[in-house]
Amino acid sequence: MYIRRIIGFFLFCSIAFSAFAEMPYRTVLRKADDHFANREWQEAVAMYDVLLERRPGRVKTYVDAVVASAMMNDSSSIMQYVVRSEMQGLSLDSLFTGIDVLSRSIGQSGIYEQVLLLVKEQQPWFTRVTNNYLLGYYVFRHDAEKILAVADELLSVMPGQINYL
């Protein structure tokens, strides 16, 4: 009798786990969105990983995953998603714009700056690109000191651009 219960339990677990693995994409997406809305960041990131395995070319999923990772202050995870999006050939503009909009919508606009500074540090070949986005962010925040610092940095590599003066 005891052996039947153990076998039954293992059979139930194997069926349950296989059913979870075969969840429709929309169901997993809804669960990820629910976790994000409830600020359950680790669970949301786990769901976004599943979604990205199924559809790796969807920018919105990368945006959500980066913001959830930033809310956990996990810089390695943030960079993992940024690099994965680059490997998929997705536009950095779409990624950065999405992060900006989403972080503002949840009242955490500092996440956008955090991500830009991290990308600038980890991928120095994107310094000019990230500085342009940082300049726009600092103008939005009316942060004169940082505006001048970024503008000076941009002018040092592009002295002919008078719009940075």
Spell out what each predicted region is.
Residues 37-38, 71, 104-108, 140:
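Register position in tetratricopeptide repeats
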Residues 56, 90, 124-125, 159-160:
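Short coil turns that delineate tetratricopeptide repeat
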Residues 64, 97-98, 133:
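Canonical tetratricopeptide repeat
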Residues 61, 94-95, 130, 163-164:
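TPR alpha-solenoid repeat register
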Residues 76-87, 109-122, 145-155:
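Alpha-helical repeat scaffolds
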Residues 8-18:
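Bacterial N-terminal signal peptides
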Residues 26-50, 54, 129-146:
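Alpha-helical segment of the N-proximal tetratricopeptide repeat
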Residues 34, 68, 101-105, 136-137:
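Residue-level signature for tetratricopeptide repeat
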